[in-house]
Amino acid sequence: MLSINNKLKNLKLSTVKNLYNKSSSISIILVNNNNNNNNNNNNNNNNNNNNNNNNNNFISLSTTNLFNQKLCIESYKKVNYCKKKGGGNKNNDDNDNEKNEKNEKKVKNEKKEKNEKNDGNEKVEIVEDNDLIVPLSKELLQFDKPSNKRKDWPLNSEVVIYPSNSVNFIGTTGPINLGFQFITRLVPNASGKTFLGFFLCKDAYRNNNNQIGRTIDSIHNVGVLAQVTLSPSGIYHFETIKRIRIKEVQNGQFPFIASIEPLSNDERELKDPRIAELMTKINVLSLEYRKLYPDVYTINSVDFENQIEVIDNPDYYLAAVINYYGLNYPDECQKILETQSVVKRLEMLYHMILNEQPLLALQQKIAKDLDDKTTAYKNKLLLTEQLKKLKALLGNETDEKEKTIEKYQNKLSELTLISESSKKVIQDEIYKISTIDPSSSEYSALKNYLEWLTNLPWGIYSADYFDLKHSKMVLDSDHYGLEDIKQRILEFISVGHIKGTVQGKILCFIGPPGTGKTSIAKSIAKALKKEFFRFSVGGLFDESEIKGHRRTYVGSMPGKIIQALKITQTSNPVILIDEIDKIGKRNHGDPSSALLEVLDPEQNVSFVDHYLDTPYDLSKVLFICTANSGQDIPAALSDRMEIIRLPGYVEEEQIEIVKNFIIPKTFIDCGIKLDQLSISDDVIKQIVKFYSREVGIRELEKLIEKIMRKTALKLVNGTAERVDLTLDNLEQYLGIPSYTSDRYYDVTPIGVVNGLAYTKKGGATLYIESTSEEIQKPLSSLPPSQQQQNQLEPSIKTTGNLGDVMSESSTIAYTFAKNFLYELDPNNTFFSNHNIHLHSPQGNIPKDGPSAGVTMVTSLLSLALNEPVQNNLGMTGEVTITGKVITIGGVKEKTIAAKRSGLTSVIFPINNRINFEELPTYIKNDIDVTYANDYKDVFEVAFPNKKYLLNNLKTF
């Protein structure tokens, strides 16, 4: 029997090595004394050394007789038991015996060398026994009886619980990431080793990082004990050594510490022949799978065959097989881990591998299909190349690259009007493509570049058409009104007729939505018989959309201008750039600056697109831009364009457009015949007046389409054979009128004035309302000094979502009104005793602009004089702080808004007289206009009952 004498306790140990082999249970224990002092040292020194070295004793076993070194050899070096003599495999061959004999000789030689080297400082004891398995641990040094059970850690020891998303079996090793909260809880046990308990999280908590392991109920009760070591590189490693069960949780705070108990295998069951039978069946099944599915198991499969044949420990066998198959089924693996019987664990593993066959078959099919596709592609490529070579040798077909080069050379020869510089660029690119392999990515990029260069209309221009009658007929047939624009286009054609050629121009149509800006551009192209191309720059932030992308980028292409020329196949088309006032701008690129190079006549003669990188002449292109507001157009662009404003349509124009354009078009679109629906002129007028408030025609077009749809429904249902739309049944088709009047007041109250405004959607009325609050005087009982302190200063407050310009106008108007009132009536102290609140209704709509000054002054004076403004009066104009009324814009739009609201009198600045007189007669009819040079002209019309006060004016 192998035993440890009591005298071993008193030895000064630093290293104990147990070397053994399967042919003999001889254990050689080498006891090294690291104390370099001589044996003649005094007893005190010896005693101290004994005490210091007793804490560093350790024992390590290598069970080479059980396992092949190819698999998990490092794990098995730390297994603390050895087998009886002859306890290994009975079928070991002669080679194994020879290896064991060599190991014996090697051990003896090492013992002899160490004895000679240390001059007697090493003490060696050889003990032999064939009966028992010896427990090897730190506790081994404290007992003489060989019957003690193995104790690497006490039965009731405590470990830190580490929740895991996967199941670990005995013999599993690897790195582990430990958080600070775990590291602080790791405390070595009495033997100096550090342990963790690995436990699988339950399914409900497994993939939730916020709840994983936060409660003890979220983990399973059975897991494995793992020894944790810290490598010199600072990485923690673990090795599982024992199945364990949680007995009791010692703390209620994460991470948990629990007392555990080991789950050992039944020694009698380990002798059950079914264990070896099941392991053999699993080995055979694994080898069979390798033959059936060779494409699935190709990596390290040969090593695995050798390894599983020599592993006879069931726990390590389980880990090796599961890791090889990659059985990532946490719940099933947890059941195997919790099962006490070794036989049942192996049976469960066997059935789990059997169930893997459908998945393996699918993986094999996928791998085979992929391999077949790859092989087919390779064969096709090989045959294609062989066919090319054969054709080239026979002279039946030229090379594909040669055909490509020939194609571009022919295209270049057809470009007779191309400039020499551009021609040289194409020639250089053709030469470059002839030197490049067709399979390279640069070849396809060069080919795409040559496609663009050779397909552009270099020097190709469509014929100019200067027929004024034809142009006028086209413009009149497509649009009603818009006389200014039609006149400008006819002037443009007349100049071209005299010169014999048309030079490119840049026109900009500014007007509300639905006023025909885009359609008039199409009519211009139609009148001139030129190609038409439209693109929008609204919300455009990338200047590459205008000037193209550089060829260094993947998928690069020219900008919109060059694309337009390629599509139209002419160098003098009509190009419409829509929504130019909504073009974007950012720090990394300014599309408006790129557009400047396109529209500037001095620069577009040699426009260089980033992609083409060669000049192109855009001077003959007619550019037309559209915008809703001229204020939002960049100043540099606006300076290079000829601005033509489309103010919108008045009621009479809208009625004519609905009657002559919208209704006939809608009849065709809906398929309704003329004898199936009739719409009277009174109905059209009612629709224009009470169902639409826009200055364009889009909303009117939607209303007519709605009538047509309801008519079609009645015709199809058979409820009517013909529909006659009248004022009586109009509400059945369009509902209740959306608008009744723009006016809030039939009789204008005190402090209220009807102003006129110009918006992106046309003209509109803008009411200005004022009210006052008397300032409270201080109590007379207070001392004079306190009365002066408590005296509140009069002020003005503005509301109604006014912009910065209108806010400044209100301040100017308040100052002017106080001074003007003081001269009119020095005894009127209204502004000194009242706080003023000035408001513009519809606060959800932002309002701004330099034309509300006279309206604000009039509202304040109406409040101060307690006199209402004349009924049916509208006004617009900005006032200076000295009372001068200055010019405004949007005269036509504001006049239209005044007529729509039923106003009969309008006040305009005197400098806008010419703008009003240029308006058509049907717009000016029924409007009485007063032109104001300074504010006293406004006061005379607004307050006819107070005109006598004007005699008191001295300054204004």
Swiss-Prot record:
Binding site for ATP: 511-518
Disulphide bond pairs: none
Region feature (Disordered): 37-57, 83-123, 777-800
GO terms under biological process: cellular response to oxidative stress; chaperone-mediated protein complex assembly; mitochondrion organization; oxidation-dependent protein catabolic process; protein quality control for misfolded or incompletely synthesized proteins
Keywords on record: ATP-binding, DNA-binding, Hydrolase, Mitochondrion, Nucleotide-binding, Protease, Serine protease
Catalytic activity reported: Hydrolysis of proteins in presence of ATP
Molecular functions per Gene Ontology: ATP binding; ATP hydrolysis activity; ATP-dependent peptidase activity; sequence-specific DNA binding; serine-type endopeptidase activity; single-stranded DNA binding
UniProt-listed Enzyme Commission number(s): 3.4.21.53
Ranges of Low complexity composition bias in the record: 777-795
Lon N-terminal domain ranges (all copies): 159-357
Compositionally biased residues, Basic and acidic residues: 91-123
NCBIfam families: lon
Similarity comment text for this entry: Belongs to the peptidase S16 family.
Summary of the function given for this chain in its UniProt record: ATP-dependent serine protease that mediates the selective degradation of misfolded, unassembled or oxidatively damaged polypeptides as well as certain short-lived regulatory proteins in the mitochondrial matrix. May also have a chaperone function in the assembly of inner membrane protein complexes. Participates in the regulation of mitochondrial gene expression and in the maintenance of the integrity of the mitochondrial genome. Binds to mitochondrial DNA in a site-specific manner.
PANTHER family found in the cross-reference section: LON PROTEASE, LON PROTEASE HOMOLOG, MITOCHONDRIAL 1
Protein name listed in UniProt: Lon protease homolog, mitochondrial 1
Organism: Dictyostelium discoideum (Social amoeba)
